[in-house]
């Protein structure tokens, strides 16, 4: 069993009076789905009025730790996105929809396009995913949480151009020795300025994970 507050692990198998299986007893995962509030400043203020940038940072740390915990148990989330994680007012997180988790040789058969690692090809259930795939999805999720919903590959241009940039791992933000190609500019939104205020090590880690397309084995396990 996974003994961690970030996962509602089944406590008991339930049967009817004829000893037929009817379900499982699980702890309640309280909170609000991350995608409901975190990507808009107004919604965040409405949901958690006392939260500041400090609380968002703490939330990101808790998300990273929760993914790391599951990886230690050999579990790959697979379909990691803001709709399958519940957030409480104290910043604690609970992963839900665990029926799509990849456990041992049972693949995750679903996925969410925006959080899909660019090296994916074919149907989701045709291959086993790795920690590296989760790390990519987590990096997108952390970036969007810190920038109030701005996609890391969003740029001044069309939606098709953003998708192509994600496929090739081309960011419109500089980090380490990486410089964006000519003409790649972030969209003119408040979130674009967050990048320059992030600690250098965090910028480098996120940038590396999001642009490491050809050599995905070089992505760290988790941040």
Give the ranges of each region predicted by the language model.
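Structural motif at the C-terminus of the N-lobe alphaC helix and the adjacent alphaC-beta4 loop
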Residues: 1-7
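Conserved structural core of kinase catalytic domains
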Residues: 7-59
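Catalytic-loop of the protein kinase fold
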Residues: 67-88
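Activation segment/activation loop of eukaryotic-type protein kinase catalytic domains
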Residues: 83-120
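Conserved end of the kinase activation segment
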Residues: 120-132
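Conserved C-lobe activation region of Hanks-type protein kinase-like domains
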Residues: 142-203
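A conserved short helix/loop substructure at the end of the activation segment
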Residues: 195-197, 209-222
